[in-house]
């Protein structure tokens, strides 16, 4: 009988996998509070470094209190999400395009990957509304310098996986970390059974 497969067998080297539109899932051993069980969507990955936003950290601050003009388009729960520890006083917005929508020529939209776009918060929400299913606004972001993320991946801090457009707008009551793992092949999907409270393990 062959030896059991290791979850790392499904994680390609960082240089082959990390790109705009991929997800970083915090590994079960990453217990630092800022990133524990976090799911990070990569917005940029190039020679200047890597930028992403945490998809599963809602705050208690309503979008209406910060950017009221975007309240209608904001996906539920219509709160600001904590994108990461860098520049918490700056806002970054992602949106999922409607199926079949053509963003070409639309002011204020920049393609990231698939149906996911970055939204210029100075743009007119009414002009963007027909094109998107919703927007998610993040306070701050997560950033890595050149080579830093690759080192963390080699240290097994992160699992690099493909994203679905719906991941960007997932609600706060959903366990996005577990959802992403459960849609992976065995044995990686088994990590989804890892208890939220490690004292129960």
UniProtKB/Swiss-Prot annotation:
It holds the Pfam family DUF179. InterPro entries: AlgH-like (IPR003774). SUPFAM superfamilies: VC0467-like (SSF143456). GO terms for cellular component: cytosol. Gene3D superfamilies: VC0467-like (3.40.1740.10). Belongs to the UPF0301 (AlgH) family. HAMAP family: UPF0301. PANTHER family: UNCHARACTERIZED PROTEIN YQGE (PTHR30327), UPF0301 PROTEIN YQGE (PTHR30327:SF1). This is UPF0301 protein MAP_0045. The lineage of its organism: Bacteria, Bacillati, Actinomycetota, Actinomycetes, Mycobacteriales.
